Amino acid sequence: YFYDNTFINFALENEHIFVTRTFSKLFSLAGCRLGYVVGWPEGIKMIQKLCTPHNVNAFSMKFAKALIEEPNMIETLINKHKEGREYLIEFLNKNDYEFSALNGNFMFIKPKTDADVLVKRMKEEEKILIKTYNGIGKLGRCLRVTTGEKTAMMTFINAMLKLDK
């Protein structure tokens, strides 16, 4: 959902190629465990043989029903996510942060202060949970920040302005 290019058509046209998608990242519902797989028909039949009879819980089924009944919901959320991501990237560029913004729902940011200390302060002082990672290319020790809607990114940015000096 976070990358405009897709390999779905490639998966439909080629054997042994599958594309999987999950809704948990886009909707911030890690426990939902709802997604789908796209691929050539014979391959899908093989996958169906491996599935258990009740592999989706009641919550996930209600969620899927809501998605079917409101098809514009996904596009709306994708656009909100992209707006928030672009807002964060603009802030990072304007404030001379080094970062790696690939096409997922997160990015790596090299803080101006010690990453471990900043993560601890973010949690304790701002109630923001982020992680640190080692050896991310030229960034070295950096933050792994999940991106989201603009309001969430504004909260994160305000915390960065306050704590990362």
Regions found by a protein language model. Give the residues of each.
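Short beta-strand-to-loop capping motifs
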Residues: 39, 109-113, 147-149
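Short acidic/glycine-enriched loop/turn segments that link adjacent beta-strands
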Residues: 31, 103, 137-141
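Conserved PLP-binding catalytic core of the aspartate aminotransferase-like
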Residues: 82, 94-126
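PLP-dependent enzyme catalytic core of the Aspartate aminotransferase-like
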Residues: 124-125, 135-165
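Basic phosphate/pyrophosphate-binding loop/patch that engages nucleotide-derived ligands
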Residues: 9-15
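Hydrophobic side chains in well-ordered alpha-helices
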Residues: 47, 118-121, 156-159
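Conserved PLP phosphate-binding loop immediately N-terminal to the Schiff-base lysine helix
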Residues: 1-8
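PLP-dependent aminotransferase class I/II
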Residues: 16-92, 97-100
